[in-house]
């Protein structure tokens, strides 16, 4: 890239810092007429940087000066004199920039493609028709979906309860998971539950009334159980909640999502469960609450209030657990049973008994949601939704 600068321009290097333009003119002026002398100086100190450019009117004079003065001493220093060349960076600099630019777009495209991935994952969720499958699949698949899925999901459910879901989701999304475990733990951990209970109780009344308001109920309950955080996801209650519950979430995630078609189902579940069957379950719960007999374990659970907590949590939990049925089985069995065990101190059988209720849950959730539940709960859900 080295190009000769304009003819007659010489580079003089190795100058003494004390040498100035006048000295250069005196030395080189004898070779011919000088058009320009550029002594390069430091911008800050204004001292010579030790090199200069001398331009002769005649290129021949420049050659003579270079031949004679190169290597000669000037002000005590040997100087270098040669034909000046254009800085390589000037010519070279312009070319390279474009490549980076050209590169940019690909990146963008790439990013875009990355973005597109989310929906597919969602599709994955969707494919899981079977809740149980979802869980299994989702559990393996779930975690990833969770990450990718939420965004897509946000598109879907959020609208329903977009407001709650959005904010909540974010908190629940991140916090949710931990909360989930926490939630579950909280399940286990009375402390959280107690606060929830109060809230829940509040919810309960609404629930009882609002109960029907599955949405409010779900969101409410859920929120109560999950501090709204998880439930806030209620919009995505199902999903989110599922999400919220880390395991459930994972399980659910895909399920929730997956079922987003299924999701609808899930939703049916969750909503439904919350709305219809859920409500039923809940009512049963409520009944259990009121009437321990219905769900023996529940009452023993920890008292109706606790039970409520449980139920709400569980319901909220379970509800959102569309998977409720399977997840529930999984989560429930694991989470809830665990919880149940810890909290309830119920014998394993009882815990297991839970699952049956769970089954009933599933049946009620599932049955209701799928059958009348879907229609009815859906309508309920619709109502709830409209509320939001």
Curated annotation (Swiss-Prot):
The RRM domain covers 8-86
Q: Which residues carry this modification: Phosphoserine?
A: 88
Q: Where in the cell is it found?
A: Nucleus
Top-level taxon in the UniProt lineage: Eukaryota
Gene3D superfamilies, per database record = 3.30.70.330
**Which cysteines in this chain are paired by disulphide bridges?**
none
Q: What is this protein called?
A: RNA binding motif protein, X-linked-like-1
From the broadest rank down, the organism's phylogenetic lineage runs: Eukaryota, Metazoa, Chordata, Craniata, Vertebrata
Encoding gene (name)? Rbmxl1
